[in-house]
C-alpha cells in the first residue's frame, strides 16, 4: 500500500486513508501478504525495507502496488510501463465498484488488448459461476 508516508511517519489524511485501506484488506484477506503504508522504493526493495522497517511483514519485492488515488495509480502505471520497456503489462484495472473495469489507453498494444480481454472473460465466468 503506497503512500508519501512510510510506516506511520505522517498523520496526514492521505496516509491515514492508506493505513485504513491496508487494515481493511488485512481483515478481509488475512492470508494474503501485504504491508504499508510505504514509499514506492520500500515496496520494491526488500533490502531498503529491511533497513527502514525491519518489522515489515512483506517478504521480497511487492508484486502488486496499491495507490492512494486514481491520479497516483495512473502516473505510476504509465511510468512503470515506460521504464519496463517492452515488458508485458496487464492493466490498469479499477476495482471497488460493483464489478471491475478494465481500461485500455491509446498506447495499448494488441497484446495488451488480448490479455485484458482474456482477464475480463475469466472474471465474467467466475462471476457467473459463483453468482458474485
Short names for language-model regions:
Residues 1-37, 41:
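Glycine-rich phosphate/diphosphate-binding loop of Rossmann-like nucleotide-binding domains
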Residues 24-132:
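Glycine-rich phosphate/nucleotide-binding loop
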Amino acid at each position: 500500500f503506497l503512500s508519501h508516508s512510510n510506516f506511520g511517519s505522517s498523520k496526514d489524511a492521505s496516509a491515514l486513508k492508506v493505513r485504513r485501506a491496508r487494515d481493511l484488506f488485512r481483515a478481509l484477506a488475512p492470508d494474503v501478504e501485504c504491508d504499508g503504508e510505504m514509499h514506492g522504493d520500500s515496496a520494491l526493495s526488500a533490502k531498503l525495507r529491511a533497513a527502514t522497517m525491519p518489522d515489515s511483514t512483506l517478504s521480497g519485492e511487492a508484486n502488486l502496488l496499491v495507490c492512494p488515488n486514481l491520479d497516483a495509480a495512473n502516473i505510476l502505471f504509465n511510468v512503470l510501463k515506460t521504464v519496463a520497456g517492452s515488458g508485458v503489462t496487464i492493466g490498469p484495472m479499477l476495482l471497488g465498484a460493483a464489478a471491475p473495469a478494465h481500461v485500455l489507453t491509446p498506447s495499448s498494444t494488441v497484446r495488451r488488448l488480448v490479455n485484458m480481454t482474456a482477464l475480463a472473460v475469466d472474471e465474467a465466468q467466475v462471476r457467473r459461476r459463483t453468482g458474485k
